């Protein structure tokens, strides 16, 4: 098994994950972010976001998440397009399993996995 060490490992790439990454990176903690199944989170499938400060005319969800990612990278966040499949908090440093076998050791883990839509299967839901 390949082993690496991180100060802060962030699971999830929605608004909470990227905000955590920006703050951790600005603090000099060199965060490592794993995007998960849906890079950018639910906002990547959202059209108009009109209730977020800084966008007086609104913004498309995918554009907003691209900008969050760019800002996190600008401050030094390392971003991986991979899934964290398990976390072991019983040892320190903590261990996160990436995919099937790759283990990353880390001093801190931020879980920002967000939410996912629960579809009911009714006709009006697609409108």
What positions do the PLM features span?
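FAD-binding core/adjacent interface of flavoenzyme oxidoreductases
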Residues: 1-11, 27, 32, 79-127
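N-terminal Rossmann-fold NAD(P) dinucleotide-binding loop
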Residues: 17
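Aromatic pocket-lining residues of Rossmann-like dinucleotide-binding sites
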Residues: 24
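Active-site catalytic microenvironments in core metabolic enzymes, especially phosphate/sugar-handling
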Residues: 40
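N-terminal Rossmann-like dinucleotide/flavin-binding domain of flavoprotein oxidoreductases
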Residues: 44-103
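Conserved acidic E/D residue at the C-terminus of a beta-strand in Rossmann-like folds
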Residues: 33-37
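Glycine-rich NAD(P) Rossmann-fold beta1-alpha1 loop
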Residues: 14
